[in-house]
Amino acid sequence: MLVIITILMGIILDKIRDELLSWPDVTAEPHRFGGLEFRIHKRELGHIHGDRLADLPFPMDTRNELVDSGRVSPHHVMPKSGWISYWITQGENDIPSVVELFRMRYDQLKPKTSLKDAQK
């Protein structure tokens, strides 16, 4: 049973990683406290500790909205910061929610295309 759970958990991280790395300019590297960190240019989008926990930084107003909605928890180590924690408890069913949080952060950090650039 443990082997099956371990295999399924690896699948979750693989699916999230594959999706995030398909986005322009996103890279992945080992996180300093364990897990896998995702970055856009030099800024951290967030990181995943194994297949059980995703941590992402947001501006405080966004963080508060997410926590107040019940979608996420305050960060498990720094609860008063802008960081949030999303506990992966529903297996593969949590993948869309984790990806959506990373997309929110990505949209905040990706370079903005100016009207002048768009006309080129």
Stretches found by the model and what they are:
Residues M1-K120:
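Charge-dense, helix-prone N-terminal extensions
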